[in-house]
Swiss-Prot record:
It comes from Danio rerio. It is found in: Nucleus. The gene is med17. This is Mediator of RNA polymerase II transcription subunit 17. Residues 60-73 have a biased composition (Basic and acidic residues). InterPro entries: Mediator_Med17. It holds the Pfam family Med17. GO terms for molecular function: transcription coregulator activity. Its main location: nucleus. GO terms for cellular component: core mediator complex; mediator complex. Keywords: Activator, Nucleus, Transcription, Transcription regulation.
Length: 643
């Protein structure tokens, strides 16, 4: 059996279906039978187009001869390559030609199938001839009924979807309301009273004593229609604010020279710029902040009004409508107004005569807010906190008395506290005095070119005191003319001037007094500059005085003078400078150069001729030079003999 030729046995598959799956309960699932196209594709996959077309006998003989030859080979020559000899010489050529012919035939068949579409056409399925054709009317009725059923299904589905969307929107709005309420609670104080949610806008928790309740109510926003599109600025939460806290407000503080008509003052006219209402500005947080600001402004104005009535001053304060008028200095008035705009009334058109620049002092408004917060802090700190009830034994007076006990003066000074109005009036006085000082210095600097005046303001100031350093110099001679350096300390009602040598002069709030003082200092600067220039040029200072008692009397300060002599002593220059009279320069020549010098019979010695003669005035306006010091330098250089 083993030595005989191999016999090929053809086994066909049974017609039964193959089992695809057996379930747990014993049910068998069969593979569905293949269609004609699937069966054809399966059979085509079995064809091996590379296999030769020899007969089965030739193949069997070659296989048997190959096996016999393989057995006859020795085992040690297994690695060597063995070639089977051909049965006849043209056997290989025949096989190659046959394979080439087979491939060409297959290629021809494939091209024919691709080119001719009739080979790819399948036979139509035969229909039952007994089936009668349905009339077209019945077809239309059936289609209409089918479409109606489908439409009802679609409408029911759309209704369910819209209902689900509305429920989701309601749930989302409820969630948004809760989240907004949580956010509101994190920023504002809320409490539940019955079925209402109330909030507090007042500053009572910070120490405020203002009697306004400042209560607002939180409500749910139900004005929106769920069937329509929700706007972008929609907020599920809304707040109800008291009507007297609606709108915006601020405290206007201004200093005016002429008092306006008090009876024409109103609330709306003070609001020059009406803010346009934006949709985003109607959110609850912006409305609550604006309402709290209105409440704070009303508290500030109420405190100022109460103090204005209670304070006893030489010039009483006036409280009219929403305005408080005070006079810090003669001819000036301080106006503090409460400007409240609810946005309901339209702003009146301002007349041309009232179109003035905004004189609102924002610094004082900011200081008012700081002062009221300090007042709240003091009120809150004065509350007695919990403390131990036990104390050491002994009499209370003996326990409190001692070497560190307060006397009557200290106790009375502690009891004297300044109110909000007094502090803001003092700050207004200081601000006005500082601005007027700066204006005076700037006017002198722009009006007088020689000498030059410079002001260096300090950045570190107080609400009641400021300082400025004033330098008076001459252009081109800044290094040698540094004698006039003033430190002005601007207080509430006076100005303290500190000289370079430490002298202190106190000036009042009058503008003319400061201007006269600076003019006298500028006049003295010219004389000091001549003194410093004489030292540099080698001239000798014969006399110097800041206050000359001779000559015309100056209405502003006193005149100053100096006399210098040339290095050889032949020439002398006398300078007299006054704030009003101006500069006067005299030159004294030797007697030998005097034209009208005659011989005296009494003086026969020639040495007396070397004495200087009378003074001659110099036409100072005709001198060349850009400033006083430069002209004086040219004059000294002309009178100095060459070595």
């Amino acid at each position: 059996m083993s030595g005989g030729p191999a016999v090929r046995v053809s086994i066909e598959s049974s017609c039964e279906r193959q089992v695809q799956e057996v379930s747990l309960d014993g049910m068998e699932t069969y593979v569905p039978p293949l269609s004609m196209s699937q069966n054809l594709a399966k059979l085509v996959q079995r064809i091996d187009f590379c296999q030769s077309s020899d007969s089965e006998e030739d193949g069997a003989e070659r296989a048997r001869a190959g096996r016999e030859q393989w057995k006859q080979e020795p085992e040690e020559d297994e690695g060597q390559l063995k070639f089977q000899p051909s049965l006849w010489p043209w056997d290989s050529v025949r096989n190659n030609l046959r394979s080439a012919l087979t491939e060409m035939c297959v290629l021809h068949d494939v091209l024919s199938v691709l080119k001719e579409r009739k080979y790819m056409t399948l036979d139509p399925v035969s229909q039952d001839p007994a089936m009668a054709k349905t009339p077209q009317v019945f077809q239309l009725i059936s289609k209409k009924k089918s479409l109606g059923t489908a439409a009802q299904l679609l409408l029911k589905g759309a209704e369910k979807l819209s209902k689900s969307v509305s429920e989701n929107q309601e749930q989302r709005r409820q969630r948004d309301f809760n989240s907004e309420l949580l956010r509101l609670r994190s920023q504002w104080k809320l409490r539940k009273v019955g079925d209402k949610i109330l909030g507090d806008l007042s500053y009572r928790s910070a120490g405020s004593l203002f009697p306004h309740h400042g209560t607002f109510e939180v409500i749910k926003n139900t004005d929106i229609d769920l069937d329509k599109k929700i706007p972008d600025d929609y907020c599920p939460l809304n707040v109800q604010i008291p009507s007297d806290l609606e709108g915006s407000a601020y405290i206007k503080v201004s200093i005016q020279k002429q008092s306006p008509d008090i009876g024409d003052l109103g609330t709306v006219n003070l609001f020059r710029r009406q803010a346009k209402a934006k949709p985003a500005s109607q959110m609850w947080h912006s409305r609550l902040e604006a309402a709290q600001n209105v409440l704070l402004c009303k508290e500030i104005f109420a405190q100022l009004s109460r103090e204005a009535v209670q304070i006893k001053s030489q010039i009483p304060h006036i409280v009219v409508k929403n305005q408080i008028i005070s006079q810090p200095f003669p001819g000036l008035q301080l106006s503090i107004s409460l400007c409240h705009s609810t946005g309901e009334k339209k702003s009146q058109r301002s007349s041309p005569d009232k179109s003035k620049p905004d004189d609102h002092l924002y610094v004082l408004e900011h200081n008012l807010h700081q002062l009221i917060r300090e007042f709240h802090k003091q009120t809150l700190s004065s509350v007695v906190m919990p403390h131990p009830a036990s104390a050491p034994f002994g009499h209370k007076r003996l326990r409190l008395a001692g070497p560190l006990a307060y006397d009557k003066a200290e106790i009375s000074s502690l009891q004297q506290t300044e109110g909000l109005l007094e502090k803001i009036i003092k700050q207004a006085k200081h601000i006005f005095l500082r601005s007027r000082t700066a204006r005076t210095i700037d006017s002198l600097a722009s009006r007088i070119e020689d000498p030059q005046i410079q002001a260096h303001w300090s950045n570190i100031n107080d609400v009641y005191e400021s300082s400025v350093k004033v330098l008076i110099t001459s252009q081109g001679y800044e290094q040698i003319c540094k004698s006039i350096q003033l430190q002005l300390n601007i207080c509430v009602e006076q100005i303290r001037v500190v000289h370079r040598d430490g002298r202190v002069i106190t000036l009042s709030h009058q503008e003319q007094e400061l201007q006269d003082f600076l003019l006298s200092q500028m006049s003295q600067h010219q004389v000091h500059a001549v003194q410093q220039l004489a030292k540099v040029m080698g001239w000798h200072v014969l006399s110097f005085s800041n206050h000359v008692g001779l000559g015309s009397i100056e209405s502003i300060g006193n005149a100053s003078s100096i006399t210098v002599a040339s290095p050889s002593g032949e020439y002398a220059i006398s300078v007299r400078n006054g704030p009003e009279s101006g500069c006067k320069v005299l030159v004294q020549f030797p007697r030998s150069q005097a034209k009208d010098a005659g011989r005296s019979d009494a003086v026969q010695d020639g040495k007396w001729t070397q004495l200087r003669g009378a003074h001659r005035e110099v036409h100072w306006d005709r001198m060349e030079g850009k400033n006083f010091v430069y002209k004086m330098e040219l004059l000294m250089a002309a009178l100095t003999p060459c070595p």
